Amino acid sequence: MLGDHKLTWSPIFSVIDFVTRVLSPYQFNPANYNPLRDLVEQSIDFEVLKRPDCPVKLFLSATNVRTGKVKIFSGTEISVSAVMASACLPTMFHAVEIDGEAYWDGGYMGNPALFPLIYNCKSTDIVTVHINPLFRKEVPRAAGDILNRINEISFNSSLMREMRAVSFVTKLIAQNRVVDGGLRRVLIHSIADDEFMGALSPTSKYNADWDFLISLRDQGRKCAGNWLAKNFVKLGVESSVDVDKMYL
């Protein structure tokens, strides 16, 4: 690993990158070993999250492999398997089987899925935290950079579609064209650092080095702190981003 957190010249990464291009996880990982599963089980008390009186409403999105539809896990459905399903990259891990259905990462159909927050929560504010840059100044030319940008666009596409729907409903309400009161205004906020995230190498997504993870955490806290200082007073009052300009 280089000082800039790239894994481009890492022998281990090169081997993994090659193997995942020519073999499926059912071939190179027949035992379906995923170290993340043990960490999640040790770190999260799922029984607390399942309680009806739990103050936190958690919604996990996954993609149904057979139907291509988004699946939202919530309430008593929350489990370690649901977490694994929501983070299952199909080139790295077996599809996660839950109740006879196979699931991949939710990012393909909902990244994140906003509709559960609109339908099932009372808050008028939705704060999205971006880990994939929406905008890049340069057109990618290297093969790896092109594939990375394709991945970013694909994972951002579902969010773009949902934001278009939010914008449409918001305009209807503003124009007094909603008469039955069945729709409500949603305020959108965004915490993002495209400059920092865009400067990272695509290979950094595979970097589990502790110092690198700490640097991401620290940058995230800095970005969130700056956002709160600037936009906290807008919560419950107005959107802090121009949805049409940013997402449409």
For the regions a protein language model found, what residue spans apply to each?
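Patatin-like phospholipase
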Residues: 1-248
